[in-house]
């Protein structure tokens, strides 16, 4: 039977529609998130259309097939900032956001800063959205995402967020959650970000899963003036449960993550590689269980004294307690050319009981799979 061109076109469109949308499902605390569900996929063609789709009240599956470059769309600002870490060419300088330079760095040299306005504040993402990239094509450049103000049931999958005023602290965050719930961030790549690659807080973000994502800290400008990004992952919400699984956290110099507020973090099967500083920073209110992770070339796995509570899954005997609260025996972490990471607080483990808990593999599985599977285009 010979198919005529109109019929072929219809079949192609149907195949495209059936293939579009979310791949797989969330593990861990955000298990059950559906995003835009079975809504007919939409394909924005302009930055304005993308902003509209993300910010309206409809359930949507939004498919990105190209780079959406926000650079220059909101103009630039030139003003006086400061240089707390010096004026060498590899050092970040700071925007005087909310008088930060004035109030917190009064002795830092003043410098002129010119930044792109679009990067400072991300795109608002409302409830019941799936934002999905096609192949390796879906990129948001020059602007991040904000899942805030009560937004819930959101999936961000297989996209890249890049180039948010990387020279400037306070130049923008890649992904912000604040007063949210049921959010799944999966196979996302972030690179060349001014401030945080991922930030939760200060209001509750409740149930969140971040999986299979690539936080790339390679930069021409950093607060440590060495090409390693300092502002990695900041988890300080007032009532948050965060699953961090299968992520590749690369070339950072600090705060990857910083955990505080009132945050229960399950860090499982992640791969930290190549840091010039520290990975974890745990303040009061941070409750961290770390298992099955790999730390390679991380000189300081944890910064200073733990202000909250930490269970590092130190050995098989100690790890048996996890079966009572997580339903499995915790997996030891693996280390190569890295600092020590050994603490076994157990009082907080009861907080995992009855929750949706991600499965855990041996660290050797993460070691072999995470670098090749994390990030955009690796579904």
Curated annotation (Swiss-Prot):
Compartment annotation: Secreted
List of glycosylated residues: 128
GO-annotated cellular components: extracellular region
Keyword Signal tagged: yes
Cleavable signal peptide: 1-19
Family per similarity comment: Belongs to the polysaccharide lyase 1 family.
PANTHER family: PECTATE LYASE 18-RELATED (PTHR31683), PECTIN LYASE A-RELATED (PTHR31683:SF16)
Function statement: Pectinolytic enzymes consist of four classes of enzymes: pectin lyase, polygalacturonase, pectin methylesterase and rhamnogalacturonase. Among pectinolytic enzymes, pectin lyase is the most important in depolymerization of pectin, since it cleaves internal glycosidic bonds of highly methylated pectins.
Name of protein: Pectin lyase B
């Amino acid at each position: 039977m010979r198919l005529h061109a109109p019929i072929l076109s219809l079949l192609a469109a149907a195949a495209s529609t059936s293939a579009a949308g979310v791949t797989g499902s969330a593990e861990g605390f955000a298990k059950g998130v559906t995003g835009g569900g079975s809504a007919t996929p939409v394909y924005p063609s302009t930055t304005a259309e993308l902003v509209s789709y993300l910010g309206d009240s409809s359930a949507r599956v939004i498919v990105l097939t190209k780079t959406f470059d926000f650079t220059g769309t909101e103009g630039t600002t030139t003003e006086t900032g400061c240089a707390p870490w010096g004026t060498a060419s590899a050092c970040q300088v700071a925007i005087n956001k909310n008088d930060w330079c004035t109030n917190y760095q009064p002795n830092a040299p003043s410098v002129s800063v010119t930044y792109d306005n679009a990067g400072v504040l991300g795109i608002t993402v409302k409830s019941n959205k799936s934002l999905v990239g096609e192949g390796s094509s879906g990129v948001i450049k020059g602007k991040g995402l904000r899942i805030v103000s009560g937004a819930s049931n959101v999936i961000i999958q297989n996209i890249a967020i890049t180039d948010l005023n990387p020279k400037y602290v306070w130049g923008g965050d890649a992904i912000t959650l604040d007063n949210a719930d049921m959010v799944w961030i999966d196979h996302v790549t972030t690179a060349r970000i001014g401030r945080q690659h991922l930030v939760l807080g200060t209001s509750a973000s409740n149930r969140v899963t971040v999986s299979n994502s690539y936080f790339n800290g390679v930069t021409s400008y950093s607060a440590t003036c060495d090409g390693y990004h300092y502002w990695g992952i900041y988890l300080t919400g007032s009532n948050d449960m965060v699953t961090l699984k299968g992520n590749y956290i690369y070339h950072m110099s600090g705060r990857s993550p910083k955990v505080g507020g009132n945050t229960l973090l399950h860090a499982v099967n992640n791969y930290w590689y190549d840091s010039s500083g520290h990975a974890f920073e745990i303040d009061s209110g941070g409750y961290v269980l770390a298992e099955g992770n790999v730390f390679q070339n991380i000189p300081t796995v944890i910064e200073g004294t733990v202000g909250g509570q930490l269970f590092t899954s130190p050995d098989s005997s100690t790890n048996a307690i996890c079966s009572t609260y997580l339903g499995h025996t915790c997996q030891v972490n693996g280390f190569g050319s890295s600092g020590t990471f050994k603490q076994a607080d157990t009082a907080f483990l009861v907080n995992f009981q009855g929750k949706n808990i991600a499965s855990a593999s041996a660290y050797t599985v993460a070691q072999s799979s995470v670098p090749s599977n994390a990030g955009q285009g690796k579904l």
